[in-house]
């Protein structure tokens, strides 16, 4: 496509520097930032926001602390020992508050929760943040919509 001018492969923290500030219409994170601890995620996100144009959109999906395999005593970044994320390396888990805090530089347009559960436990829960870069500081807000898909 002639609209894609540049593609980079590698670590966000390094590759974002090769793009001009205020040049992205949108950034879509499909559960890749959650492979970084909170501090590195903040650093990546701060760089990413600089690349968004005013009014640019940011979509991010993250792993919920409600998922089977999350262990609160291990903090929010660890390698799960059970559940669907075993043998995937260390992952960061969030809740609504921590994700909105991470992305506080953006106006929150919507906040969704996508849940997959059986009769015994939540097997998968993804948090989806939809934000927009504005000319002012963080705006907060947002709407929560829950959708449960049950296996019976």
Model feature map: region roles:
Residues 1-17, 40-43, 57-147, 152:
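Class I (Rossmann-like) S-adenosyl-L-methionine-dependent methyltransferase catalytic domain
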Residues 17-27:
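A short acidic, Gly/Pro-enriched loop at the edge of an enzyme's catalytic core
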Residues 25-40:
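A short SAM/SAH-binding and catalytic strip from SAM-dependent methyltransferases
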Residues 30, 52-53, 97:
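A short, hydrophobic secondary-structure junction motif
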Residues 42-54:
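A short glycine-rich, Lys/Arg-flanked "PGG" loop and its adjoining helix->strand segment in the class I
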């Amino acid at each position: 496509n002639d609209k894609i001018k540049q593609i980079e492969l590698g670590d966000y923290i390094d590759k974002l520097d090769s793009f001009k500030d205020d040049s992205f219409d949108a950034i879509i994170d499909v559960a890749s930032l959650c492979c970084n601890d909170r501090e590195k995620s903040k650093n990546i996100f701060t760089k990413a926001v600089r690349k968004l144009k005013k009014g640019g959109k940011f979509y991010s999906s993250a792993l919920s602390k409600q998922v089977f395999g999350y262990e609160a005593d291990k903090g929010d970044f660890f390698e799960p020992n059970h559940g669907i994320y075993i043998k995937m390396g260390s992952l960061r888990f969030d809740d609504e508050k921590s994700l909105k805090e991470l992305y506080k530089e953006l106006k929150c347009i919507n906040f969704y929760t996508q849940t997959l559960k059986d009769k015994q436990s939540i097997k998968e829960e993804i948090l989806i943040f939809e934000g927009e870069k504005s000319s002012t500081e963080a705006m907060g807000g947002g709407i929560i919509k829950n959708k449960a898909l049950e296996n019976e």
